[in-house]
Regions:
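N-terminal carbohydrate-binding accessory modules
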Residues: 20, 27-96, 341
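Short acidic-hydrophobic catalytic motif
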Residues: 142
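Short amphipathic alpha-helices and their capping/turn segments at secondary-structure boundaries
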Residues: 37-41, 85-90, 117-119, 213-216, ...
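Short, function-defining helix-loop hinge/capping sites that tune catalysis or transport
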Residues: 106-108, 139, 177, 271
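Secretory targeting and sorting signals
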Residues: 1-34
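Extracellular glycoside hydrolase catalytic/binding regions
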Residues: 64-79, 146-154, 158-167, 171-300, ...
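Short linear capping/connector segments at secondary-structure termini
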Residues: 133-138, 169-173
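Aromatic-lined substrate-binding rim segments of carbohydrate-active enzymes
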Residues: 81-136, 147-149, 190-196, 279-297
Length: 344
């Protein structure tokens, strides 16, 4: 059973059908200019973001396609759709978006179009985190195919090494590896891509990216950012905000200055009041604790998801047709808590 089956149903909603990728390959993009490191890299607290996800939870054997986009669209249409959706995220107060990649989406024909989403986001001034998801027919917490994974990252980094707003997360939730195995893989990735400034690399925590301490402690990964995940459904009987805060802090240790909580979320379509008393709701306790902790420790944060069709956790719902798209907020109190976390 998937660790994330709570997130809703696949292929629900109008704008994105389940799709199948088609074969073929594009020439690799020309090598980008050498990476330009900002004089002062932004602190993690400047990452105020949302995930933009495929209705299938980003696990796909074919191309992974964020909600509202289509593999049948060219670059210009993808850019226009993405400009509208990123504009909606900006209106929420976000300045960061996390997007999924997989070998089919990058090594195949969709990449030429998908770059429109990345480019629209960076043109808006957004930081973009590109993270690898394994296929839905694997889901063993391991890289599906080393050669295609390497080729994917070579293509992505050659395209975006020169754009300091693009960040790279080698793998989402590497739960199939021991801590030592995962840090070995991560260290090899960092060394292979040493032309990328380390502050532009997010290394997921151990297991379900749920504990950053082993990664933080590895000297080979010094200077990288750390990606943490935590969800309220992991402890459905916890209704104490303080208990949740302690749980968050136990996963971070003394590594807060490097940590971006790039997945956290709860139900946004069920009418919960995240500003109100906790009562018997583990979700309210969890969201209040998460946002308190983000604010207190100065963590980066990327809500799951800002948009995913058919997901009860989705902060927004996509409206419109064609490239005339907009977002409506599903739960204002949930957004209020994000604004509190983001000091807005």
């Amino acid at each position: 059973v998937s660790h994330k089956t709570h997130r809703g149903t696949a292929c629900v909603g109008a704008l994105l059908a389940c799709v199948t990728a088609f074969g073929g390959a594009l020439a690799s993009p020309a090598a980008a200019s050498p990476a330009h490191r900002p004089a002062t890299p932004p602190p993690v607290s400047d990452f105020k973001g949302v995930n933009w996800a495929d209705p299938r939870d980003n696990y796909a054997d074919d191309a992974v396609v964020p909600s509202g986009l289509s593999i049948s669209d060219g670059y210009a249409t993808t850019y226009a759709k993405s400009k509208a959706i990123i504009g909606g995220f900006s209106e929420l107060g976000a300045n960061t978006v996390r997007l999924p990649v997989n070998p089919t989406s990058v090594n195949g024909p969709f990449w030429k179009s998908y770059r429109g989403a990345i480019d629209a986001a960076t043109a808006k001034g957004f930081k973009v985190i590109l993270g690898y998801w394994e296929a839905d027919n694997a889901k063993d917490g391991k890289i599906d195919d080393q050669a295609s994974w390497d080729r994917m990252w070579a293509r992505i980094t050659s395209a975006y090494a020169g754009n300091p707003k693009v960040y790279f997360e080698p793998m989402n939730e590497p739960f199939g590896y021991t801590a030592q195995e995962w840090t070995d893989i991560a260290a090899k990735w960092v060394n292979t891509h040493r032309f990328i400034a380390r502050d532009r690399i997010l290394i997921g925590g151990y297991k379900y990216s749920e504990d950053v301490k082993p990664v933080c402690a590895d000297p080979r990964l010094k200077g990288t950012r750390l990606a943490l995940h935590n969800y309220g459904f992991w402890h459905t009987d916890w209704t104490s905000v303080d208990q949740w805060k302690a749980d968050f802090k136990s996963r971070i240790g003394d590594c807060a200055s490097r940590t971006i909580l790039d997945e956290f979320g709860a139900s946004m379509t069920t009418g919960l009041d995240y500003n109100g008393p906790v009562g018997t709701s583990n979700e309210i306790a969890y969201i209040q604790a998460a946002t308190d902790t983000i604010r207190e420790l100065g963590l980066g944060s990327v809500y799951w998801p800002g948009l995913r069709n058919g997901d009860t956790y989705s902060l927004t719902t996509l409206q419109g047709t064609g490239t005339n798209l907009s977002l409506t907020v599903n739960n204002q109190s949930g957004l209020d808590r994000l604004h509190y976390a983001w000091k807005q």
